Amino acid sequence: MTQKTAKILVMDDEDAIRTITCLLLEKMGYTSMATPDGETAVEEYRKALVAGSPYDAVIMDMTVPCGMGATEAIKKLKEIDPNVCAIVTSGFASEVNHEELHKQGFSGVLKKPYLSENLRDVLNSLLLF
């Protein structure tokens, strides 16, 4: 029996963060896809779910200046999939209230800048394969 490769969707408005996060994920053995904003992430998540190839987790940036950020996107993702595994990232300490983020539906939190170990640890704690 082969082990399933987790499929991770990354949403961040910064191209460099999307690229680096996807590279880190792929080095860890995950399959990844990146989007620049919440609207695109929600649509990509929905399409994958309908196609029968759902994402195992979504990593989303809290603040997207010219688009939908994580707090709005999580509401839409929860409508599509109440069991979505969503991880929020933020570089602003004032935005990171773990209890409030959990109430909103986030499964995990990553403070930017994060190391590959932080990314691996949060995914390992949430994904059961």
Go through each PLM region and give its residues.
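C-terminal output helix
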Residues: 114-124
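Acidic, metal-coordinating helix/loop segments flanking the phosphotransfer/catalytic sites
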Residues: 34-57
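Acidic di-acidic motifs
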Residues: 12-13, 61, 112
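The short loop immediately C-terminal to the conserved phospho-acceptor aspartate in CheY-like receiver
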Residues: 58, 62-65, 115
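Short amphipathic alpha-helix used as the core "switch/output" element in two-component signaling
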Residues: 43-46, 69-83
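Charged docking surfaces used in two-component/phosphorelay signaling
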Residues: 19-27, 99
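As written
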Residues: 70, 76, 101-109
